[in-house]
Design a protein with these regions (language model features):
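Intrinsically disordered terminal and processing segments
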Residues: 2-91, 96-97, 103, 107-126
Length: 126
């Protein structure tokens, strides 16, 4: 299932406040306060959750937009994945420009899994 925020732009921190807090705290503790601020400001594009596999993903729109050369000539690709010792179930995906583009959640805790499941069922905008 997928949830899209076409007409209703909300930050990651407002859609998933507890998860944003935990991930941002971990980023700050490891010297990545820049990414913590970016995570809190990113706009949620889509939320997906596969109940059978117990895997979720949140696609993010970073605050910093690509310029025309980056977008049309270089192109956006997956650049880096940041994993955490706590929480182990979450990882961040950065593009080849170092911008945050997604959060992957493998076997999240039951409450977060429920929130992902519910959020992925919503249809906001057209």
């Amino acid at each position: 299932m997928q949830w899209s925020m076409t007409n209703r732009m909300q930050s990651f921190a407002s859609v998933f406040p507890q998860l944003a807090f935990v991930l941002a705290a971990e980023l700050r503790a490891t010297g990545r306060a820049d990414l913590a601020r970016e995570l809190e400001a990113c706009i949620v594009k889509t939320v997906r959750f596969d109940s059978e596999a117990n895997i979720g993903s949140v696609a993010l729109e970073p605050p910093q937009k690509l310029n025309s050369v980056e977008r049309n000539i270089v192109g956006q690709k997956l650049g880096q994945v940041i994993t955490f010792s706590r929480p182990r179930y979450a990882s961040l995906q950065l593009d080849n420009f170092g911008r945050l583009i997604g959060v992957e959640l493998v076997a999240p805790p039951p409450r977060l899994g429920s929130a992902l499941r519910l959020t992925s069922r919503n249809r906001w905008g057209a």
